[in-house]
Amino acid sequence: MKELIEKIENWAEERNLINGSTPQKQFIKLMEEFGKLCAGISKNNIDMIKDSIGDCFVVMVILNKQVGKQSRGMEFFSFGNPDMSDFTIDEIVSDLADYAAHGYERPFPVVLGLSNIADVYQLNFEDCIRQAYNEIKDRKGKMINGVFVKEADLGAKND
């Protein structure tokens, strides 16, 4: 997991996401990805859930790096195996709000929530992250107003 986090950080640095964007813009991206996760859950779409869990984690690694925090430790969780009654989306939304309110200092409850969602859907958390990284590792694009826009979306309108 540590190597995967380092690859994500390097990918973000190569695309100027660390210094060329802001934590606030990355948090908006995190909310976008979390919205996709909620859509996947509401549709019981396992592929969308897996993709979104990984995407949320990738954005959190980037955000963590932007605020100067070491991403070490994000890989040292010992996650349980909750059932659906132990997990609610509103708890993660609350954790996301706390994460932003406290200057992005406390990513762990959000990461734990993402891991719990993976467990509920019998997904391997690290596989979710690996899939997300493999999807973005060769992605090209450009920074526009502090937001990385992937090459495929550069010609799209209002997407």
Model-derived regions, located:
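Flexible "arm" and connector segments at domain edges
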Residues: 1-159
